[in-house]
Amino acid sequence: MRCMTDFARSRAGLGALADSPQLDLSAEDKAADVLRCDSFSHTACGREFTYWMQQAGYLSEACWHVGENLAWGVGTYGTVRSIFRAWMRSPEHRRNILGDYEALGLSRQVGELEGQADTVVWTAHFGSHCETATS
C-alpha cells in the first residue's frame, strides 16, 4: 500500500510520505476498533478517527492537519490493489492520498465484520503539522 501511495504521489509531482510509527499504531488501533465493534465507520465505537491519533501520541501539539482512509473487503476485494484502486476512484480518499501531508501510517487487519469472516480492514492515517500544511 505504501509503494502504491508513493507511486501515485510521484506521478502527481508530490514527494513520498514519511513513515510514522505513531500513525502506524493509530491506524492499527482504528482497524482493531472497527473489527471489535463490528462497525465500519470513521467513528467506529463512537470514537472520532483522531482519538486513535491522540492515543498514539501523534496529536501532541496544538495544530495538526490529518486525514483517514478506511476500507474493507473480502477475497479479491480486500487486496492492496483492489482497495487502492477504490480509494483513487473516490474523490475524498484520493484527496487524502495526494494531499499536503508529510507522514503516513498504515494497517491491514483481518477479522469478522458484518457477519463476513476473513474480512480485510485497511486503514491509512495521514498527518502533518499545520506549519508545513497549506490546506
Locations of regions flagged by a protein language model:
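Short, well-ordered surface patches within globular domains
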Residues: 1-54, 58, 100-105, 109-111
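A well-ordered secondary-structure block
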Residues: 49-130
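Short, solvent-exposed mixed-charge patches
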Residues: 134-135
